[in-house]
């Protein structure tokens, strides 16, 4: 029996798909994450934008091209939003985003397998994504995810530590829909970080919200043996007026102060971010504030995308900007982001850094430094090992590097 588990969307979706794959492998099945011939397809969908939702709906037809008689099981945010659309396509089973274990129950029941629930995800040799929470209570005016993922739910610290202890990966990434709000009973994200102080693994964080950046939080991170100082601090707009309309709960000035605080504790930190181009209320003046904050903060990387109105959100009721304006602003943001990324990497040329080797391809071993600079070393190096390197020049989306210690 062969199964394909195909995923669209965020890192949380990827972690959940990895759990589904690990469970199906326990059934003794051959499992792949690439669309190809299979007896069973599990399609994990996304609805963060209209384009993502469209691609999700098209997945059923794409799967059937490989095997018209395959059994198709659908889960994720797009099927949570519109379950009927998938049921009408004649798939075997549809669940949503909130309990993906139902997929396993449905498959186990149909094929006579033991329903043991979702397994811990099978990890790569280098990086383990550890899901610490799900859901979001923020209800930003443009975002559909809280309506689909539901209210925030966090895992016990003991369960998280147990999963980390079982992985052989040298790096773990704490992951979730809104990890800044992590809290099981009386524990907080700070408490979880402190509980990791004795781990020898490199600890990296998923996307963060502005409110979590405090001296207490940064001090806890300083206490880790091996912290990767990359802070993905979601911005969305550089304009305080637009942030208000987005229901983001901070101003431009407050965001900049949080970034300054990060640099006080971690001078070499990579601060990366998301910015929406062309939100419904965004004027040209507002947009210029988004453009200028890229240089002011010194972002190491900018993920920019055009505003996509999502039915069911507050912002959906607002008058949308013309597509050409959104497109033009997006291109300007992307260009500014490329300049900022290159400027950040140049700071580290001819300086010693470490990186964990991830893969060897076309004559290069690649991987990432703690501050998330992609490294290209023109040698074969064993994956999963940490090496000392010196960056020599900018190359593609990172930098060439020479090996200085094995």
Where are these regions (language model features)?
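Residue-level signal for inorganic ion chemistry
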Residues: 42, 77, 103, 174, ...
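Glycine-centered loop/turn positions within well-structured domains
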Residues: 101, 138, 150, 180, ...
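Short, solvent-exposed loop/turn segments at secondary-structure boundaries
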Residues: 52-54, 151-156, 183-187, 245-248, ...
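Alpha-helix N-cap/loop-to-helix initiation residues
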Residues: 13, 49-52, 79, 210, ...
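Terminal RNA-binding accessory module
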Residues: 317-406
């Amino acid at each position: 029996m062969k199964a394909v588990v195909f995923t669209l969307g965020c890192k949380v979706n990827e972690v959940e798909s990895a759990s589904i794959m690990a469970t199906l492998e326990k059934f003794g099945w051959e499992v792949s994450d690439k669309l190809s011939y299979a007896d069973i397809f599990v399609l994990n969908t996304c609805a963060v934008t209209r384009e993502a939702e469209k691609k999700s709906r098209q997945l059923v037809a794409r799967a059937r091209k490989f095997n018209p008689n395959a059994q198709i099981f659908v889960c994720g945010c797009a099927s949570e939003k519109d379950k009927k659309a998938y049921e009408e396509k004649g798939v075997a089973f549809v669940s949503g985003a909130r309990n993906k274990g139902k997929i396993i129950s449905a498959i186990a029941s149909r094929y006579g397998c033991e329903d043991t629930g979702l397994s811990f995800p099978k990890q790569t040799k280098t990086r383990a994504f550890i899901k610490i929470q799900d859901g979001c209570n923020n209800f930003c005016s443009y975002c559909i995810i809280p309506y689909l993922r539901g209210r925030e739910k966090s895992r016990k610290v003991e369960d998280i530590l147990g999963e980390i202890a079982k992985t052989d990966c040298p790096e773990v990434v704490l992951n979730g829909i809104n990890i800044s709000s992590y809290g099981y009973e009386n524990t907080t994200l700070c408490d979880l970080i402190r509980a990791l102080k004795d781990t020898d693994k490199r600890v990296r964080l998923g996307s963060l919200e502005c409110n979590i950046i405090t001296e207490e939080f940064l001090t806890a991170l300083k206490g880790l043996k091996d912290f990767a100082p990359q802070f993905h601090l979601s911005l969305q707009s550089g304009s305080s007026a637009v942030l208000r309309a987005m229901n983001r709960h901070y101003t431009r000035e407050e965001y900049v102060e949080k970034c300054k605080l990060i640099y006080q504790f971690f001078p070499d930190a990579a601060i990366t971010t998301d910015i929406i181009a062309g939100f419904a209320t965004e004027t040209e003046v507002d947009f210029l504030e988004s453009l200028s904050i890229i240089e002011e903060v010194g972002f190491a990387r900018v993920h920019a995308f055009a505003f996509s109105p999502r039915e069911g959100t507050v912002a959906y009721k607002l008058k949308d900007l013309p597509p050409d304006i959104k497109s033009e602003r997006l291109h300007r943001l992307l260009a500014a982001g490329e300049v900022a990324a290159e400027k950040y990497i140049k700071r580290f040329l001819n300086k010693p850094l470490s990186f964990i080797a991830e893969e060897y391809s076309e004559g290069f071993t690649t991987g990432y430094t703690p501050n998330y600079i992609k490294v290209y070393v023109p040698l074969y190096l064993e994956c999963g090992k940490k090496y000392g390197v010196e960056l020599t020049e900018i190359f593609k989306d990172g930098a060439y590097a020479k090996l200085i210690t094995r």
